[in-house]
């Protein structure tokens, strides 16, 4: 009997310490909040509720007609998917406007027959970001993206796919600079 009693006496302090530590841990966890954001946005939703994304007109020398609408909608869609901001045409707490300033083809590598083997398609967009909540975060900047394709293919055959890729890249860069702060 004395042997069993010794074991239970030794367990009592360890059990008490465990209970105390567990209680302290529970109190700390209930008083602290840990938040993980996987979209990278650093928006204070108590002060910033909306973003307006104006249409981006195409002022480039070479014009691909759907580009203006595709870019504007691509940017709006990204903010709708990645944030809780209300996306408006105008009058938002955050404002994005700009224009397509460049859409050009450049010959890249030269093949053995002295003709271009690859062509680079470059899209350039000038953006004005106005933060009406924190004006010091407003900026004006140009964004570019490019894609290359085999020169044996016609631009009309690859244009839609290449533009979609470039629009996605530019929209993500704009998003990162405006609300993600990366």
Regions inferred by a protein language model and the residue ranges of each:
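Short coil-to-beta-strand
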Residues: 47-49, 137-143
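Second-shell loop/turn segments in exported
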Residues: 57-64, 153-161
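Compositionally biased, intrinsically disordered linkers/stalks adjacent to structured regions
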Residues: 159-182
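Short polybasic linear motifs
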Residues: 12-13, 21-24, 28
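A structural "domain/chain start" motif
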Residues: 31-73, 77, 84, 176-182
């Amino acid at each position: 009997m004395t042997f069993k009693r010794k074991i239970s006496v030794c367990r009592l302090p360890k059990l008490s310490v465990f209970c105390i530590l567990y209680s302290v841990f529970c109190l700390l966890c209930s008083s602290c909040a840990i938040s993980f954001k996987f979209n990278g946005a650093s928006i204070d939703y108590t002060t910033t509720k909306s973003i307006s994304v104006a249409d981006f007109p195409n002022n480039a020398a070479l014009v691909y007609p759907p580009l203006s609408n595709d870019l504007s909608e691509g940017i709006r869609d990204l903010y709708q998917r990645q944030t809780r901001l209300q996306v408006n045409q105008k009058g938002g707490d955050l404002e994005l406007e700009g224009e397509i300033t460049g859409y050009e083809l450049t010959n890249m590598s030269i093949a053995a027959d002295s003709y271009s083997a690859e062509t680079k398609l470059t899209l350039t967009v000038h953006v004005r970001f106005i933060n009406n909540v924190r004006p010091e975060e407003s900026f004006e900047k140009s964004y570019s993206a490019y894609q290359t394709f085999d020169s044996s293919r016609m631009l009309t055959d690859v244009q839609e796919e290449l533009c979609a890729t470039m629009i996605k890249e530019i929209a993500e860069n704009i998003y990162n600079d405006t609300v993600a702060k990366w």
